[in-house]
Regions:
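Fe(II)/2-oxoglutarate oxygenase catalytic core
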Residues: 1-228
Length: 228
């Protein structure tokens, strides 16, 4: 059994923290089997362009337990600050032509630098990894409450100047530039701040395969403080 391999880096001019863990789970195939038994699969709300269903609570518990010290070292967040986790099986299914403008640009999950997001790959490098971006006109690489309104206004100005974006972003554009890319790899976890601008690398020839064993199948997790 392979031991997990953890790498930490800081990306972009704002030096946002990024963690990558390879061989994260001892038996990842069990998650695929679990997913196939789930009956409630729905079109995702929000900006995710595909299908989602609940991942087992044990996945989130394992993540919090295994990475508690690493999260404190890399993100400066104590275990007491991250006691709640939501995890969802995720499968890209929305054709490029059906995307909204906000799905065609990098997004941030929440404007909260003290909350984290993770993507865990149950697919290989053929399905595209995750890229992190800088917004060219503002220089923002992460969106916080202090800059959110300014960022949204700048986006509207960009749309007027360059046109409304269409399709999946997968590399540099007039509005955004790539500051880091993490390729997909089976059993790889990527952990970053919820405020970081990012997007999956969905290429124009993506087949929208709805089979968890052969499509772009991942688990998305969101870590935050316990609810009051």
């Amino acid at each position: 059994m392979r031991q997990p391999v953890l790498r930490f880096s800081r990306i972009g001019t704002q030096q946002q923290p990024l963690m990558v863990v390879d061989d994260f789970i001892p038996q990842p195939e069990q998650l695929l089997q679990y997913a196939l038994q789930q009956g409630e699969v729905k079109q995702a709300g929000g900006l995710y362009p595909g299908l989602r269903s609940a991942a087992p609570a044990a996945f989130g518990t394992f993540l919090l337990q295994q990475l508690a010290q690493a999260v404190q070292d890399c993100f400066g967040l104590a275990p007491t600050q991250l006691q709640q986790i939501e995890s969802y099986f995720s499968l890209v299914s929305t054709p490029a032509a059906a995307l909204s403008p906000m799905q065609s640009i990098p997004h941030f999950d929440r404007p909260c630098p003290d909350e984290l997001a993770a993507i865990y790959y149950l697919c290989d490098e053929r399905h595209g990894g995750t890229s992190f971006y800088r917004h060219r006109s503002t220089g923002y690489e992460a969106i916080t409450p202090e800059c959110q309104v300014h960022y949204q206004r700048a986006l509207q100005a960009d749309f007027q100047m360059h046109g409304v974006p269409k399709g999946y972003i997968c590399g540099n554009t007039p509005l955004f530039e790539v500051i880091a890319t993490v390729p997909a790899r089976f059993n790889r976890l990527v952990l970053y701040r919820c405020s970081s601008l990012h997007s999956g690398d969905i290429k124009p020839d993506y087949s929208y395969d709805l089979n968890p064993f052969s499509g772009r199948f991942t688990i998305a997790s969101f870590l935050s403080a316990a609810s009051a």
